[in-house]
Design a protein with these regions (language model features):
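Conserved C-terminal portion of the radical SAM core fold
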Residues: 1-20, 39-43
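Small-side-chain structural scaffolding
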Residues: 3, 33-34, 49, 63
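Generic structural signal for secondary-structure transition and capping sites
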Residues: 8, 36, 78-82
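A broad, low-specificity signal for short, low-complexity segments enriched in glycine/proline
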Residues: 8, 24, 31-34, 59, ...
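Structured beta-strand/loop patches that form or line metal/cofactor-binding pockets in enzymes
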Residues: 18-40
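Flexible mid-to-C-terminal extensions adjoining Fe-S/redox cofactors in radical SAM and related proteins
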Residues: 26, 45-134
Length: 134
């Protein structure tokens, strides 16, 4: 709440309360958000998320932009092996992921859509601040 108090007419602080208040708990088991927000470490490592940069998660490492083009990495079989694994029953986001996941809201939406709980319809009202907002 203190952070929000720094907002003024020229600067807005937007706290993601819905994300913070979940305390890292997830209603979904699969990670569908990784292809929408893939991450690159400071050393060039490409992985589904920052939590997986650690060497102990090397099975999720997709490539390194210091060794091959990003385009080649995301068009590779390895990319889809990792993405398909994250969306499979062999991966459980509830027990295998850290808290404050960047893909959390995307995962909530896509999981609801996949289960039929969320229907896609033409947007109504004021457009979001950015086309990628879910």
């Amino acid at each position: 709440e203190e952070a929000e108090s720094y907002s003024d007419e020229d600067y807005q602080v937007s706290v993601k309360w819905s994300k913070i208040n979940t305390e890292g708990k997830r209603s979904y088991q699969r990670c569908y958000g990784a292809p929408f927000q893939i991450q690159i470490s400071g050393s060039g490592l490409v992985a589904p998320c920052g939590m997986l940069f650690n060497e102990r998660y090397s099975r999720f490492h997709i490539g390194n932009i210091t060794q091959q083009r990003f385009k080649d990495i995301v068009n590779s079989d390895r990319y889809w092996e990792v993405m398909n694994h994250l969306a499979s029953p062999n991966f459980d986001a509830q027990t295998m992921c850290g808290s404050l996941c960047l893909q959390h809201k995307v995962n909530e939406f896509l999981d609801g859509y996949k289960k039929g709980d969320i229907l896609l319809e033409e947007p109504k009202g004021t457009p979001p601040n950015h086309i990628n907002f879910v």
